Regions:
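Hydrophobic helical h-region of N-terminal Sec-dependent signal peptides
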Residues: 16-24
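Exposed beta-sheet edge and beta->alpha loop/turn motif
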Residues: 106-165
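Short solvent-exposed beta->alpha transition segments
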Residues: 42, 48-49, 64-112, 118-119, ...
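Glycine-rich phosphate-binding "P-loop"
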Residues: 38
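Short helix-adjacent coil turns
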Residues: 54-66
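Bacterial N-terminal signal peptides that target proteins for export
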Residues: 2-16
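C-terminal motif of bacterial Sec signal peptides marking the signal peptidase cleavage site
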Residues: 26-29
Length: 165
């Protein structure tokens, strides 16, 4: 003689299946989250891209690309000449920027950075390593350009390493 399971067991089984199904649908259906403020998010992405472009231009010793990111200010002309001196002095530059924080206040953008890198004069010589922290000051909305620097940034290592030798 065969007995049917009590109704409570069948109800429990169906309830479990429904809950598992709802969890699966929720997990797969809500996986794509759009930014709350899309214009600010797009601007943030442009700042990050400008930082990556600056890093790449410096590592590849690409003076025109480096120049394109700078506002025409006297402080940045000095920065650019220091970078060009690095390009002429070192055969190989490896640099890693890490963005610690980005603060956007109207048209003023501050990117707080940590960095580490190695600079090698020639293949026969050993490389010099350095690390530090600084702030890249950017400006703009659609086009992001460097307007200043603060702190210890890697540009101008040729003169710094000559002084410490």
């Amino acid at each position: 003689m065969r007995r049917e399971p009590p109704a409570i067991n069948r109800l429990w089984g169906w309830a479990t299946l429904i809950v598992i199904g709802m969890v699966c649908l929720t997990e797969t259906g809500c996986s794509k989250k759009t930014p709350k403020y899309p214009e600010d998010h797009a601007r943030f992405q442009r700042v990050v891209q400008a930082i990556k472009t600056l890093e790449t231009a410096y590592v590849n010793k690409d003076a025109p690309a480096f120049h394109e990111l700078l506002l025409p200010l006297e402080q940045l002309e000095i920065l650019e000449s220091e970078a060009q001196q690095d390009f002429a002095t070192f055969s190989t530059i490896h640099l890693d920027f890490t963005v610690d924080r980005i603060v956007i206040d109207g048209n003023r953008i501050s990117a707080f950075m940590s960095w580490q890198g190695t600079w090698q004069r020639s293949i026969q010589e050993s490389s010099d390593s350095a690390r530090g922290h600084g702030v890249l000051l950017w400006s703009g909305n659609q086009v992001i350009l460097l307007r200043g620097v603060e702190g210890d940034l890697p540009f101008g290592m040729a003169s710094r390493l000559n002084r410490s030798s």
